[in-house]
Amino acid sequence: MLAALGGLGLLVLGVRGLDLGALATALAQVDGGWLAAAAALQGLSLLFGGLAWRVGLTAGVARLPVRHVVGAHWIGQAANTLLPARLGEVARVMAVRRHVGEGAPVARIAGSLAAQRLLGGVASFVVVVMVILVMPLPGLLGTFRPWAGGALGLAILMALVLPRLGLGRCALGMVPERLRGVVANVVDGGRVLRSGRARTVSLVIHMGELGAQLGSIIALLRAFHMQVPMSAALLVFCLLAMASLLPSLPGGLGFNQAAVVAPLGSLYGVGAPVALAFSLGIQATAVGVALLGGLVAVCHERLCRSHTCRGAAAGRAGAVEPSRRAGRRPRPGRAHLVP
């Protein structure tokens, strides 16, 4: 809640003293073609996110059709744009639960989602570190290279050492008895973390998701006619990835603007109205694509539910009719009449 209020405060501070006329001009001059390309790449990013979650569900819960998992992923993303603190993840879990059946508890589905989020965070961390290490960054950002290299080395060391220490078993033993079943289901749902092949496939898909997000940012820079180098797009991508880790207003409103406007102005000389218009364009593109895809997914879920109900009703009617016929006595016909 405090983080959400902080995001709102940052948004209010960013708007105060701003030339609203210049902001309106920047929004009015946006290129529609590049904006459509950014929206398409944002949709592709959400598709990759759903596919990555399906890999985790297959490893830890059940094998589900792609359309149901991608639809649930899109519903959750749409709910995140309307609810604060990423509460839309609950809608994501409940949307996919009806397709799993009664055999898998909610905790196992939530475990698969948590594992997918963890792998997505690992992919984002690797991309951010590689950007800092490889790309020429302006100003003080270039001094972050030793820290980025140290963070990468520490992460690799932890990935190699922690699985051998058996800390998971010790932590599970410290859980109260009444909660061990829930924790065990969560761990079972995150089985993708222990499956080498599934983990690799999921990480590759997450890399595709991040690549689509970066492409969407580049297209939006072109849409707002911002003449900045490639490092600006990478910087915006990294800042938005870090801002997404904080619970905030619906869709990350406030934190996203604070993460984009000041760095673009101080490092690349972009005016505050244009930078704010660009950040609002990022926000509007993400929200619009999520809501449109979520609406389509909800309609698809309702159609599937109606077809399922009709099939079940037809099956019950078909089962009742033979039983009625079996219990019915034959009517006397002409052959049974006595002349």
Protein language model regions, located:
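Interfacial segments of multi-pass membrane proteins
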Residues: 96-100, 236, 258-274, 278
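Extended non-transmembrane interhelical loops and adjacent amphipathic helices
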Residues: 55-58, 70-101
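Discrete transmembrane alpha-helix packing/kink hotspots characteristic
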Residues: 83, 123, 289-293
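Hydrophobic alpha-helical transmembrane segments of ABC transporter permease domains
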Residues: 114-133
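Transmembrane alpha-helix interface/packing and boundary motifs in multi-pass membrane proteins
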Residues: 76-85, 238-257
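Predominantly cytoplasmic-facing regulatory/coupling regions of multi-pass membrane proteins
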Residues: 1-74, 133-245, 270, 277-280, ...
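Membrane-interface alpha-helices at helix entry/exit sites of multi-pass transporters
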Residues: 66-71, 89-90, 101-116, 270-281
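Hydrophobic alpha-helical membrane segments of integral membrane proteins
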Residues: 94-95, 110, 123, 204-205, ...
